[in-house]
UniProtKB/Swiss-Prot annotation:
The keyword Metal-binding applies. Residues 41-62 have a biased composition (Polar residues). It is found in: Nucleus. PROSITE patterns: ZINC_FINGER_C2H2_1, ZINC_FINGER_C2H2_2. Residues 1-21, 35-65 are annotated as: Disordered. May act as a transcription regulator. InterPro entries: Ovo-like, Znf_C2H2_sf, Znf_C2H2_type. GO terms for molecular function: DNA-binding transcription factor activity, RNA polymerase II-specific; RNA polymerase II cis-regulatory region sequence-specific DNA binding; zinc ion binding. Belongs to the krueppel C2H2-type zinc-finger protein family. The gene is OVOL3. Pfam families: zf-C2H2, zf-H2C2_2. Signal peptide: none annotated. This is Putative transcription factor ovo-like protein 3. A zinc finger (C2H2-type) spans 70-92, 98-120, 126-149, 165-187.
Length: 190
């Protein structure tokens, strides 16, 4: 298994999924995270988020770095849109608002936590139609298709791809939001 998919655990011997074929890895295996002892203790309240808690830090302004770009005041990166700069500024903050309940790793963005949780659950919703190998991320599937099967991306640069709705409880996938909503209702009813 590539190192990118390995996650450190406080468990003495983490579960080894290497012997499982991809067909079984795609099915839901949700470990009991309570056995890991929960996430590490929150940071003390004396540690403050410099981006929201202190008004004196509110004077961080983005310096234009060229026509139509906004520069980060803390590093040399530049962005075409304010929302992209705002998202980037979170990477400089020491506070991680989204904590993994299994290992305690923190993330700035809720989606990054959702993607990380797949390393614990084993859910691999992106399956190769040619060989059946499954992946946790769409970009990994696309790289596999290009390298192994020689299939170039079937979309143009910056073209929006079809969204895949993934149930993080059981691994169910659907490209239709109404089908996904019906499936989620089954989990709530149970």
């Amino acid at each position: 298994m590539p190192r990118a998919f390995l996650v450190r655990s406080r468990r003495p011997q983490p579960p080894n999924w290497g012997h499982l074929p991809d067909q079984l890895r795609g099915d839901a295996y949700i470990p009991d995270c309570s056995s890991l002892g929960g996430p590490p203790a929150q940071q003390s309240s004396s540690v403050r988020d410099p981006w929201t808690a202190q008004p004196t830090q509110g004077n961080l302004t983005s310096a234009p770095r060229g026509p139509g770009t906004l520069g980060c005041p803390l590093c040399p990166k530049a962005f075409p849109l304010q929302r992209m700069l705002t998202r980037h500024l979170k990477c400089h903050s020491p506070v991680r608002r989204h904590l993994c309940r299994c290992c305690g790793k923190g993330f700035h963005d809720a989606f990054d936590l959702k993607r990380h949780m797949r390393t614990h659950t084993g859910i691999r919703p992106f399956r190769c139609s040619a060989c059946g190998k499954a992946f946790t991320q769409r970009c990994s599937l696309e790289a596999h298709l290009a390298k192994v099967h020689g299939q170039p991306a079937s979309y143009a640069y910056r073209e929006r791809r079809e969204k895949l709705h993934v149930c993080e409880d059981c691994g169910f996938t659907s490209s239709r939001p109404d089908t996904y909503a019906q499936h989620r209702a089954l989990h709530r009813a149970a």
